[in-house]
Amino acid sequence: MFKVTFAFENGSTVEAFANAGDNLLEVARGANVAIDAPCSGNGACGKCRVQLKGGELDSKKTLHISDEEYNAGWRLACMSKITADVEVLVPDIASAYKSRMKVADLSSKEEIAIFEKAKHEVESAGIELTNSLDVIEVHMEEPSLDDTMPDNERLTRALRKYMNLKHIRIPYSVLKKLPDVLRNSKFSVKCVVRTTPNDMFVYDIFDSKEDVVIGGLAVDIGTTTVSAVLINMESGEILAKSSSGNGQIRFGADVINRIIESQKPGGKKKLQDAVIKETINPMIHEMCRSIHFPEQQIYRMCVASNTTMNHLFAGINADPLRMEPYIPAFFKTNSLFASDVGIEINPDAHIIMAPNIGSYVGGDITAGTLVSMIWNRPEFSLFIDLGTNGELVFGNSDFMMSCACSAGPAFEGGDISCGMRATDGAIEACTIDKATMEPTYKVVGDPGTKPVGLCGSGIIDVISELFMTGIINPKGKFVREGKRVRHDHYGMGSYVIAFEEEAGSVKDVEITEVDIDNFIRAKGAIFSAIRTMLNSLDFDVSMIDDVYVAGGIGSGINMANAVHIGMFPDIPLEKFHYIGNSSLTGAYLMLHSTPAEKKTYELASNMTYLELSTVPTYMDEFVAACFIPHTDTHLFPSVMEEQQKR
């Protein structure tokens, strides 16, 4: 056995032991060391970079590590085997997805405006903002020798007087508290309850003098990013908001790699722990700590995620999803409780899940569709959720059709050499001067934050600017020379947005021809899915009245740039609307409003699912879309006209 020491830039270390020949990335995973590996350790992405500080490794040479970097000790963890005791440095950029959990500043009106707008819109559509949770104050006669009724029956009798229900359930967690709370309060208590027409469930019990807030948790589990809000269930007020990288990402950037990993011995538990123990629970703790809110007072949770994430969250085998005929274990389920999956809130908290529509169109889309309001408008609208799985819904108040395309993780920074989530240090907007080829960019974070990488919106801007200024051609190849354009000894071109001395990372922030090619395929998947779905309905893009774009890829997408690269159709820009993380907003509405929850189930039931792989023309559409903006430039007249003017 050899000792493997993982050192971090903050000075901390983690030690593990491994056998000769063990893969370094697998050793890191076993030691719970977070190293970003979107390609699941296939050597394709180049993101699992570590620096050899002592000892030896048997490492394969790779195009992702230059000779200069190799001589400085840089290696890919997935391409390295243990041969002796070794110490490696794990740079912050390699574990950024985990280390950069962020609790939002709710003093900013922008953070809550989108939720308030969504509440107003669904309420205007006749959906009441009410739910089944309540606080009931109960006063009981104290026991005596003449009244020896046990505590639980005494409470049940009092509650039944308040609401004439036949079935009242008091769980073990409340039963444990009952003797002390009743006597300390002199039998005057407040109960947190869930009431239906037939029964009541008692979640908690307090002294009647206490102020009791009913907490609720809405969570969007994205393949790359997890976002959550903690709310007051009675008022709908957002108490705290947080986001973090999905801890599962070290097992692969896409759902297929995650499913494959889950089939290994102990795999389902590893994937479930990565998203719950390593991601969601720390987010809960941090949100509650920031506002001094008891975690045990979160009594309800709503999860919105794609179909695969739903299964992995629940610890259910997802393997049938990747094989024909692509059958999930469930589309809808209401049988989960916090204690079932290890969510560290009230153990009896009920977990509701936004319903899935198909094997690759999940609850995140039904929740987002609720927010988009296309179901309440006569105009034809298109809803697009930009994530690792690109999902679309088209329709109006009469019909809706959905489909999914495998866009890959590029929109959230995956498959891009300097890609990252939209967190501190991410370049989220960029322009390039045509004459000087010099960039001007905006970085996520406080003023003065140095760039570390590119998030989705920044990638869109950079590629658009490179194309519109003639630095790259429609194939994404560099055709102009300059200080920031360079080619390696293999001939691969790249453009440097921030040199190492300008950046907050250990290398230049750049975008390569391989990155551009990966992104062209991602945007091509979106555009070809739009064309295929519209063609199946005999619709033309000119018939689209509004396009609602969702996804946590930055503070907002420059819609003009998205059209320039051929990701969205060439229609008037005023038709595009960015609605942020609609999955989280929809989960919030479902959590706060039982009628909104019911409406979401109705939307899922009434939506037609189009399986793109069964459409003969889809692959032709995809191949045609893998140019900037498209092989058929007549589809993008305004883009070609503007490029000529520049």
Model-predicted regions and their roles:
Residues 306-320, 491, 539, 551-570, ...:
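Short glycine/threonine-rich loop-to-helix capping motif typified by GTGT followed
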Residues 467-537:
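A contiguous, well-structured pocket-lining segment that forms one wall/lid of small-molecule binding clefts
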Residues 66-72, 76-218, 223, 235, ...:
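Nucleotide/phosphate-binding catalytic cleft detector across ATP-hydrolyzing
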Residues 396-398, 539-603:
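Catalytic phosphate/nucleotide-handling subdomain of diverse soluble enzymes
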Residues 247-289, 415, 426-431, 518, ...:
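N-terminal phosphate-binding loop and adjacent alpha-helix
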Residues 138, 295-306, 463, 541-551:
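Short glycine-rich phosphate-binding loop at a beta-alpha junction
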Residues 219-223, 228-256, 320-335, 367, ...:
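Glycine-rich phosphate-binding loop of actin/hexokinase-like ATP-binding domains
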Residues 34-59, 67-84:
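Local cysteine-cluster metal-coordination motifs and their immediate loop/turn environment
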